[in-house]
């Protein structure tokens, strides 16, 4: 069922429990279940949850190995790397374009739906990019995962986050709409919506937390990306200002 997206938390939390306590039983729980039960999440084309699921499991195991918290095994690390590369590309393939020439990774509701949650799955695109991967598309076209991450971050900041600048009568600085709805035929923005919040015109607090956590994650990641690469994507100043404004709103 759709609630299986929480398996990333379930097994990832065991890995973090080991990280905090050095209790080997939690490492065993997290590692075994990641290997035995997380593969469907890596290739899942129907959700926006790759960051929650795969970075929380494969990503944390890889991190612990690189930090010498667990023994280094090159083949095991290759396994984690492959999972993270595939996850980022699969997540990036779930793409809708917008009328302003940008786009977003759409939610499990369908191509019309941009969730604020998904900013925290941009981790999967960023990690896959950092590992040298891209999304291969029709006619062997190579799609930059970094580009898609930044486009998604821009769209979320533009449509889901409110800045108190008079956008509409509900534009209160710091308000976050859980969901933005688009016309799939022409990519035009239609209205705010909500999957789990009280209403489209209130703030879903958990969604606000995703914004507050998700943008700083990407700001930290951007410190590993060269100015030269970012120049073709709007420039470091513009990209970082956009993310910082969204996180602070």
What residues fall within each predicted segment?
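Glycan-recognition and catalytic cores of secretory/periplasmic carbohydrate-active enzymes
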Residues: 1-249
């Amino acid at each position: 069922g759709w609630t299986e997206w929480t398996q990333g938390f379930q097994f990832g939390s065991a890995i973090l429990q080991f990280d905090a306590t050095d209790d080997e039983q939690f490492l065993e729980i997290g590692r075994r279940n990641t290997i035995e039960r997380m593969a469907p999440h890596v290739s899942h084309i129907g959700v926006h949850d790759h960051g929650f699921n795969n970075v929380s499991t494969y990503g944390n195991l890889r991190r612990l190995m690189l930090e010498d918290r667990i023994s280094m095994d090159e083949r095991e690390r290759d396994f984690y790397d492959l999972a993270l590369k595939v996850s980022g590309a699969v997540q990036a393939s779930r793409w809708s374009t917008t009328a302003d020439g940008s786009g977003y990774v759409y939610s499990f509701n369908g191509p019309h739906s941009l969730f604020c949650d998904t900013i925290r799955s941009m981790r999967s695109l960023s990690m896959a990019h950092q590992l040298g991967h891209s999304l291969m598309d029709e006619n062997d076209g190579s799609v930059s995962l970094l580009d898609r991450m930044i486009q998604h971050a821009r769209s979320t900041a533009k449509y889901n986050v409110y800045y108190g600048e008079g956008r509409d009568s509900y534009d209160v600085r710091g308000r976050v709409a859980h969901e933005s709805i688009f016309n799939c035929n022409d990519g035009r923005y239609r209205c705010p919506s909500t999957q789990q919040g009280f209403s489209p015109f209130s703030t879903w607090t958990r969604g606000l937390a995703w914004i507050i956590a998700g943008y700083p994650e990407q700001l930290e990641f951007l410190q590993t990306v060269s100015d030269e690469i970012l120049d073709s994507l709007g420039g470091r100043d513009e990209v970082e200002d956009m993310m910082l404004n969204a996180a602070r709103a």
